[in-house]
């Protein structure tokens, strides 16, 4: 057996590592959690010991279906410390309550340490409530008129300023599918259009554009290592190794 992931080298040069697990069978999901735990620890140590505190290449972890990989130990502390080492984690959840179910009281700490949050849509009550409160209120002008008729008719108008939720829970639940709400640290939340992936310069390289671009995992795993003239190898005689 040998290590072919080389997790500690991800911050040395531009590298893409894909961790793919079944979305219907959770038997081995704990492996993903273990990989992330080891990845964060190795990269933080290397950033401190080799590069003076920061990796030369930023490492971005896009953790889709974060709730399905199990608990990453001490994640609430890691998300607060990895940023200074040029490491970031993007947690993708269906609903915010998934995070609470796994990390309990530490869920709020994890969310609080995120520099940006994006809401793509949903109808889960807790998520909508938290988002509506985060957006705050706006000031609206309210006019009330009264008209009394009879022997002594009267007419009156009152004007007042009132606070109103910027977006209520029912408005968030029916948010346009092409819109999203983004909050960046130090900036008021704002409504934005979702990015059109078909406009990305590399879209033509995806399988959505052309099925010929689909990556065949089985074919890749079954590939044979090609040996070229001049390649050097270390030969170890197992019989000469000292016994344990």
Explain the meaning of each model-derived region:
Residues 1-87, 102, 170-191, 200, ...:
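P-loop NTPase motor domains
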Residues 79-181:
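Conserved ATP-driven motor cores of ASCE-family P-loop NTPases powering translocation/secretion/packaging/pilus
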Residues 196:
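Short, surface-exposed polybasic-aromatic patches that bind anionic ligands, especially phosphate groups
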